């Protein structure tokens, strides 16, 4: 192939070391990042957080990691999108952030977890009227009304 493949031995040693520190080895999930893997979703994150106490992430580089590592540890291939990155570090960060949000107490407010937030596209703050290069941009009147029902309807319409 066009790039180097990471050797199995150092990765195997790292995974063994991580597993040795885990008490309940039956609740461990090992994930390998791959553009051809199962698509990572919020639903996947929720289910994983409920089912596993520990998750080990394999973040490859170059062409990837020796395939025997995945076979030995039954690692699941996960993809964060239909594109190729230079390594698994960014997918690991995405997974960690999304899964962490699912753990009680991580977020300050439960509302921060709402799935509806994914569909919210516009947010406003002060001042009510913003002037930029001679042009005025105003906060929509409905948001200033204080009428929560109308505001929710406006949000759903966006």
PLM features per residue range, with description:
Residues 1, 30, 60, 140-143, ...:
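A residue-level signal for conserved active-site and pocket-lining positions in enzyme catalytic cores
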Residues 2-19, 145, 149-158:
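N-terminal nucleotide/polyanion-binding subdomain common to many enzyme families
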Residues 4, 57, 79, 143-144:
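Short conserved micro-motifs on helix faces and helix-strand junctions that flank
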Residues 5-61, 66:
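S-adenosyl-L-methionine/SAH cofactor-binding core of RNA-modifying enzymes
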Residues 50, 71-72, 136-138:
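Short hydrophobic "helix-edge" motifs at membrane interfaces and signal-peptide entry regions
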Residues 62-64, 85, 129-131, 147-150:
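Short Gly/Pro-enriched loop/turn and capping motifs at secondary-structure junctions
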Residues 65, 69-112:
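Structured adenosyl-cofactor binding patch, chiefly the S-adenosyl-L-methionine
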Residues 90, 102-141:
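Internal, active-site/partner-interface "lid" segment
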